[in-house]
A protein has these predicted regions:
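Domain-scale recognition of functional cores that engage charged ligands
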Residues: 1-236, 278
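Left-handed beta-helix
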Residues: 125-365
Length: 365
């Protein structure tokens, strides 16, 4: 999957590593390991990453609270346990020992889909100079961040904690979403002191991170398959466990995640540039500070549907404040979106935004 200028996430990450001359480690899941190794082999890169495997947990049937049995595809009986598993997997695989033997004392950990998360020497210096065991990068919450996890302080001991929406009782959701009270969210960019982590894991063996129950369908492609719980944890939650852990406020430019096709549309657009040193940065020609994207999940929710509707190119979003697409709409080349726009197709078949169109107001096709 290419993300910018025909380059994949891995290609951009590897170029960043080459530019910064640092060691790269990858945590793969059981479902991504083979494809990742094949992609790296095809790249013919000089970078030789340390690769270790994430553990896998059984999916739990919501109805019985027992483990899933799915003979038609036994691989669907398991799920990766979230990125909170990184500490245990790193230690149990022997990879932590290998890094320490090679003189590596500090790790910067981020999601591979967040290409804004490059290693920053000033942050590394701050982390090392102060002797922190753990440091979480946080950014200021905006109205678009109300559903994401936020940083808080535990009253009984003053320790930082991370609270996710899935851990919040329904009656507290209003307070959870108050961005004036809970001002900072976790970017999921984490700094870890590896000698400290090694000592901790030797004593504890596992991290008792807060449990996250994600309710999903057993088969992601079959909405009628049984409802299950996936047991997961978040790596940022370690901020509540490591004594002396801290947080540092960073610019939002260090968080450019691609979780959904709407995020991919944004990063592929002219609002972002890929620099010579493989950084994803905001285009200085942007006329708007913020933008929201809402794509109809029926037609843009899967990558194949998304690609087919933008095969002629991504619209210019330099002057766009918001873009909402409802219905089946295909875009031809050199389309420009200006301001806040809703494009809606109320017909049963697909319709098209023609080549060279400038859409500056709501459009019903």
């Amino acid at each position: 999957l290419w993300v910018k200028n025909g380059k994949s996430f891995l290609e951009i990450i590897f170029k960043q590593v080459e530019q910064q001359n640092v060691r790269l480690a990858l945590m793969n899941s059981f479902s991504t390991d083979r494809e990742t190794r094949e992609a790296i082999s095809a790249m013919r890169t000089a970078v030789c990453p340390l690769i270790f495997l994430q553990h896998h947990f059984p999916k739990i049937l919501k109805e019985t609270l027992g483990p899933v049995s799915w003979p038609k595809n036994s691989a669907l009986e398991w799920n990766p346990p979230g990125h909170g598993n990184v500490y245990t997997a790193l230690w149990a695989s022997g990879s932590l020992d290998e890094l320490l033997k090679n003189g590596i004392e500090y790790a910067f950990i981020s999601n591979s889909d967040n290409l804004g998360a490059v290693l920053d020497a000033s942050l590394l210096g701050y982390f090392a100079e102060n002797g922190f065991p753990f440091m979480m990068e946080v950014a200021e919450r905006t109205p678009s961040d109300i559903k994401g996890g936020h940083l808080a302080i535990r009253k009984k001991d003053g320790q930082f904690i991370l609270r996710e929406a899935a851990q919040c009782p329904e009656e507290e959701l209003t307070a959870f979403q108050d961005i004036q009270y809970y001002r900072y969210f976790n970017t999921n960019n984490i700094w870890v002191n590896l000698p400290f982590l090694n000592r901790f894991m030797q004593q504890a063996a596992v991290l008792s991170l807060p449990l996250i129950l994600n309710e999903k369908t057993l088969d992601p492609r079959d909405p009628d398959s049984p409802r299950v719980f996936q047991i997961e944890s978040a790596m940022g939650a370690a901020v509540s466990i490591f004594k002396g852990a801290t947080a540092v406020l960073v610019q939002k430019s260090r968080m450019v995640p691609v979780k959904k096709c709407g995020d991919l549309l944004l990063v592929r657009s002219d609002r972002y540039l890929l620099t010579e040193d493989a950084r994803i940065v905001s285009n200085p020609d942007c006329k708007t500070d913020r933008i929201t994207i809402a794509l109809d999940p029926r037609y843009y929710g899967k990558i194949d549907g998304f690609e087919s509707r933008f095969e002629s190119g991504i619209p210019s979003l330099l002057e766009c404040e918001s873009l909402t697409i409802r219905g089946d709409v295909r875009f031809e080349a050199n389309v420009k979106i200006v301001g806040g726009v809703v494009i809606e197709n109320r017909k049963s078949g697909q319709t098209t935004v023609k080549t060279g169109s400038v859409v500056s107001h709501d459009l019903v096709l």
